[in-house]
């Protein structure tokens, strides 16, 4: 016969991890890109995905991606193509922001960080200007 373990009143139930507010992170990242909508085209897709591309078919008859935000299971990704297309831009990425990079052009965030988002906004402005120089915009 199996005996049940006695439960102690000192035992506490396991606490669930608080859910990350990825919707808030997504919205904050989207605010960085919204000023560029008037110069670019928003690709309609899904609520958890936001993408800006050039209006002109500038590369092999297709629009060029500028940036995209994707809400994932563990973080929100900010894909930023000017950094990929112009590797020299990577030299100007602050070390704190570079820690969030995955691959050549993706930054992952699990929470809103105003200081990092300001750095990302400056990088986005520089990337937009690089697209103007390349005549993508």
Task: Place the predicted regions along the sequence by residue.
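Charge-dense, helix-prone N-terminal extensions
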Residues: 1-137
């Amino acid at each position: 016969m199996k005996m049940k373990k006695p439960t102690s009143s000192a035992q506490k139930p396991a606490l669930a991890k608080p859910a990350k507010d990825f919707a808030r992170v997504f919205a904050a990242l989207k605010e960085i890109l919204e000023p560029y909508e008037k110069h670019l085209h928003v690709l309609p897709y899904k609520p958890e995905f936001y993408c800006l591309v050039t209006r002109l078919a500038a590369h092999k008859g297709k629009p060029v991606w500028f940036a995209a935000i994707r809400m994932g299971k563990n973080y929100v990704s900010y894909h930023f193509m000017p950094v990929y297309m112009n590797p020299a831009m990577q030299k100007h990425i602050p070390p704190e922001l570079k820690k969030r990079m995955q691959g050549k052009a993706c930054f992952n965030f699990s929470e809103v960080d105003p200081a990092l988002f300001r750095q990302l906004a400056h990088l986005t402005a520089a990337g937009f200007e690089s697209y103007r120089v390349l005549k993508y915009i």
